[in-house]
Amino acid sequence: VLFICCNFQLVLAQPMQELPVDKNVRIGKLDNGLTYYIRHNALPEKRVEFYIAQKVGSILEEPQQRGLAHFLEHMAFNGTKNFPGDETGLGIIPWCETKGIKFGTNLNAYTSVDQTVYNISNVPTENINVVDSCLLILHDWSSAIDLADKEIDKERGVIREEWRSRNSGMLRIMTNAQSTMYPDSKYSDCMPIGSIDVINNFPYQDIRDYYAKWYRPDLQGIVIVGDINVDEIEAKLKKVFADVKAPVNPAERIYYPVADNQE
């Protein structure tokens, strides 16, 4: 374990090199600050992948919010404006599965310290309505997750079980090693799984406040790659995301430094 941690630190210590921009990627930014990246890729045929990446993770949580970045990722699948998951319409998961997009395999998300990413993969392009609906899902994740009281309470139990199953010896070693790996840094105490006390007891408004504060277009990027017409997808994306407002007096997204560790 020590060998792994030491090598992990060495990797972190390497200077970041700027990646070259693929000339085949269509890159643009909407007036609200949303950035998008679209690329045609002929293989696999008649398939496309959708991603929405947030420059948001557990590093931005306040002490009373420990675990809410990860909790919010779960809530993104539990009801949105256009996919409510109730008597008025299918939720995201059942709708996707009716189109052959399997939850956990083709429909998923992850939360890390500095980012949260959602994906819809292996989407068939033959039916343009499916492609349009996937754009609508990205829209809802960006700004229209419901966060209903009853769904939050249901998800507390799901997160508790995930917390329990992940609370292994290896995770405890990693958690305890953070203060050594990142001395005097906020990175020393911001594991995405969070605090079980917070998960059990946070007020509903706390997660709504976190969502409103950090899920905003200037911190979001859309990535669409596949066997698609780039011009058509770009036009659709601009139309779908036109109603997402730019933030007013947005909170600063601080990028916390990590000091060199000589020991």
Could you describe each region identified by the protein language model?
Residues 88-94, 146-164, 229, 248-262:
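Acidic/histidine-enriched alpha-helical segments
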Residues 38, 55-62, 75-82, 117-127, ...:
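Second-shell loop/turn segments in exported
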Residues 75-80, 109-114, 130-137, 141, ...:
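Scaffold signal of the M16-like zinc-metallopeptidase fold and its non-catalytic homologs
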Residues 1-15:
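Bacterial Sec-dependent N-terminal signal peptides
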Residues 184, 221-263:
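An aromatic/glycine/proline-enriched structural segment found at the starts
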Residues 49-121, 173, 189-193:
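M16/MPP (pitrilysin/insulinase) zinc-metallopeptidase core fold and M16-derived inactive scaffolds
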Residues 17-52:
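Mature N-terminal segment immediately following signal peptide/propeptide cleavage
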